[in-house]
Amino acid sequence: MNEKYSALRSNVSMLGHMLGNTIKDAHGEPLFDKVETIRKLSKSARAGNDSDRAKLIDELQNLPDDQLLPVARAFSQFLNLTNIAEQYHTISRHCEEQICSPDSIDSLFGKLNANSISQLDSIQAVRDLNIELVLTAHPTEIARRTMIHKLVQINKCLSNLELSELSHSERQRVEQRLEQLIAQAWHSDVIRKQRPTPLDEAKWGFAVVENSLWHAVPEFLRQFDEKLMRHLGEKLPLDASPVKFTSWMGGDRDGNPFVTSEVTREVMLLSRWKAADLFLGDIQELVSELSMVKCNDQVRELAGEEHEPYRAILKDLRTKLTNTRDVLAAKINKQDAPNLATIDDVDQLWTPLHACYQSLRECGMGIIADGLLLDVLRRIKCFGIHLVRLDIRQESTRHSDVISELTRYLGLGDYEQWNEQDKVAFLVRELASKRPLLPLAWQPSAEVQEVLDTCKAVAEQSREALGAYVISMARTASDVLAVHLLLKEAGCPFRLDVCPLFETLDDLNNGASVIKELMSIDWYRGFIQNHQMVMIGYSDSAKDAGVMAAGWAQYRAMEELVEVCEDASVELTLFHGRGGSIGRGGAPAHAALLSQPPRSLKGGLRVTEQGEMIRFKLGLPDVAVNSLSLYASATLEANLLPPPAPKKEWCDLMDVLSEVSCESYRNVVRGSEEFVPYFRAATPELELGKLPLGSRPAKRNPNGGVESLRAIPWIFAWSQNRLLLPAWLGAGEAIQYSIDKGHAQLLEDMCREWPFFSTRLGMLEMVYTKTNVGIAEYYDQRLTDKSLWPLGQKLRDQLQQDIKAVLNVENNAHLMEQNPWGAEAIRLRNIYVEPLNMLQAELLYRTRQQDEPSPILEEALMVSIAGIATGMRNTG
């Protein structure tokens, strides 16, 4: 590995050595030697040594069944530790400038000055800053909570080892602690034995807040504040909350029968309990710190005659928070809740603490006010008494089913059979009516009752507890109006954002016309109070049409939605449903935001953070601070220095690229009879269904083909055999087509001058770097029928041609030339991923040969799937 990454290499080597010792202690020298042999042969095979490749295959095919699991676990754990070392390196003091780019906020102000952006405009943009990160389960997040805790502890040890003043014995103790943690991880289950429930997923999300975001948010705001003061001479307002967090865990019922109205209620109680518990810890600490006596009149009035007025106020809050926790615990456990004074409104926390803050400043103790107390005030504004807000998500047909069943009961006909015009007229009439629509005597079916119960659960909450109601597979104006009507009938006393999610190619293309129709309805315009949220789906559109066509459809949809809402003088918030992988919209945050259409971030940024990406971007406080800074700087830059509108000839060529790439993608995925059998044989798609990943079934329709697969297992399966097909298919072919038609210079101009296009190519480069045609070919040879080999060869040949086409447009000799750190990081992990790939192919072969399932083989297979996902760093 390059010399400039020596600190990282040293940590990887140390952690690997410690894991080796653990394996020796647990399984003896012979197994450790076997693991080392496989690792060395794999490294040599990757360098092109065909003789060692043959030896490696022979070694794996002759492994006895009882060695498969420990060998798979060894490489999986090596990858976990490599990831930790890499993640830590980005925040360590040894981080090279190629990795740790200059501070994103400082860099931004440099750009603003260079472009003569006025101080006034900058200050206004900061005040308007509104970033909402939506934590979603889709847990491709394979790591269990227990493992994540150990990984955080390992990170702390690496940090301690950087301290130059450590004595020899102190260093030994830290190294011993590292060895203990690695041994603990080795002797624990790597993967879950049962699927997580929606409650488990929600608790995982709360753990991320508790372990990382609770600490990261005040630190991010403290740093942001200092930079604003330095560059603009202005501080953040005390009540500013430029960042907020929402969750789908326990609220996303799209295709997940396990997320019921009862589950949603319980998750919201748990969320409040965790918030009360965390604030109680903060208040306890403040009781210790704020022993001061001098105060202003307001605090004196709140504290009465107490000698230590701040402590008196804090102790009262402590009692109420303790009561709140006890009452919520009773409700969670379905017990009678005691009648106690509790915190039920965020102002009950904010008002007394804000009074303490003001008093300390007025009494010459500003330095004390700006310590922990300021952090707690910042947390109150960010997390509130609910910790995270909850989104509700449901599929559009579930709402129309409710109204169809109701209209049939009322003798009005079948709503489902009406045309769109009649549906809208009926819904608007009922929305404007003051009388209730649901008859008391009506006894709906269980599925319909569940939708109604969910709307009731929403109506019971306070507005602050909720984010938005997202309608997946939204296609029409009536889809949006139907939800508004159901919420009205449930007695919802507040306006909740009802957010259509446009996710297929056709729906993205029609999205703006749906919003335009809604804006023409007087009732709707009056009700939404000049604010509209729309979600752009990345994963299903890419599965439907391929990444190039999907990316362009998303861009055009955003452009058109911005225009429609500007014409109607309505503020638009675009909600981005990105995934961790490229095939689901994943891209480095900064590049992705700056490649969006001009003015598309004026209404703020709302974006999903999914599964494993939550851990990589937000799982450690220091890493989370960096991620929040990147989001803030990119959003500010996009609003203050928007990218130029694309030239007409660029858009015309993108239309061609989109059409050609979509046709090419669909010709393979839909047009080839061999494709589905090949997909099922060459990837672990069928076996993935057995992995206890998330609480959702892997298919919307258990009997369907590829089209019924959720986007996550579709991408996940292809990332396992290293072909990563959905993340590139069609794109390179379209680029080569345009080169052949004489558009090479235009493509180069687009790459150089248009952030949207250059970001697309950069994403493709990263995908290409992660592919491995040799590994994909081995899966074919070991697992597929010979009749399917030509299809596999055709796809691999296409991949090689596509890489050349993209490098040609970029004028680069090698992939990821502009991102050497990213390329090094992928190479570093490949040392351990490739043996796991070869082992997985062997495990799949043996599993499929057996009539009866073998628990040993199945567990080893699950470990290999988890390990490759860890190594690829974006599972789905």
Curated annotation (Swiss-Prot):
What Enzyme Commission number(s) appear in the record?
4.1.1.31
Reactions that this protein is recorded to catalyse: oxaloacetate + phosphate = phosphoenolpyruvate + hydrogencarbonate
Tell me which cofactor or cofactors this protein depends on: Mg(2+)
The leader peptide range reads none
Q: Is the keyword Protein biosynthesis in the record?
A: no
Looking at the Swiss-Prot or TrEMBL record, what is one Pfam family this protein matches?
PEPcase
PANTHER family associated with the record: PHOSPHOENOLPYRUVATE CARBOXYLASE
Protein name (database record): Phosphoenolpyruvate carboxylase
Q: In which organism is this protein found? A: Photobacterium profundum (strain SS9)
Lineage of the species this protein comes from? Bacteria, Pseudomonadati, Pseudomonadota, Gammaproteobacteria, Vibrionales
